[in-house]
Design a protein with these regions (language model features):
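Charged, glycine-rich intrinsically disordered N-terminal tails and low-complexity linkers that flank
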Residues: 1-75, 79
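Nucleic-acid nuclease catalytic cores
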Residues: 62, 80-105, 109-171
């Protein structure tokens, strides 16, 4: 059975004062429109700390995705204990006085021997991997930008690798 990982509380608490990878679609929408549509107001109010959302719901599909993610982490960690689950990766470059940018990649490996940082974003979905990549491209972009910054802060000779892990829930 998958071990329970206590990262959800940290992810929820970081919603105030920060935009994250899951806000990528919202940021792309704002950039594309050239203004902030009303559909983004609630998330931005949470980010600014002027609105608190108490009812974070979890659907059956979300719970299944978390379970699968934890099982994949268990497999990775059993092969290499350096794997981390959902660490907080906070940008220094894209932080200003009143808002920051961060991500919690599902799995992270910092390989000192090979000088490679690997981020893996895991998606449990009933879509194909191509559709999943297209649906989550904005989140992957933010994780890529933050991953490159994180890697450059470790050292110039280091390389960064972002992977999409896909589990099709249709069987």
């Amino acid at each position: 059975m998958a071990e329970e990982y206590n990262y959800k509380d940290e992810i929820l608490s970081s919603r105030v004062g920060f935009l994250g990878g899951s806000d990528g679609a919202m940021l792309a929408k704002i950039a594309g429109l050239g203004y902030v549509p009303t559909s983004c107001n609630e998330r931005l109010a949470i980010c600014k700390g002027i609105y608190t959302k108490e009812d974070y719901f979890v659907t059956e599909a979300m719970a299944l995705g978390d379970k699968i993610e934890n099982q994949i982490y268990d497999m990775l960690h059993s092969q290499d204990e350096r794997w981390q689950s959902n660490p907080r990766i906070e940008s220094k470059k894209y932080k200003c006085k009143n808002v920051g940018l961060l991500a919690h990649p599902d799995f992270v490996l910092v390989d000192e021997d090979k000088k490679i940082v690997t981020f893996i974003e895991c998606k449990a979905t009933n879509k194909t991997i191509k559709e999943a990549r297209r649906n989550y491209i904005n989140q992957l972009y933010i994780e890529s930008v933050l991953g490159k910054e994180y890697t450059n802060n470790i050292g110039k000779a280091w390389k960064f690798n972002l992977k999409l892990c896909h589990y099709n829930t249709d069987g």
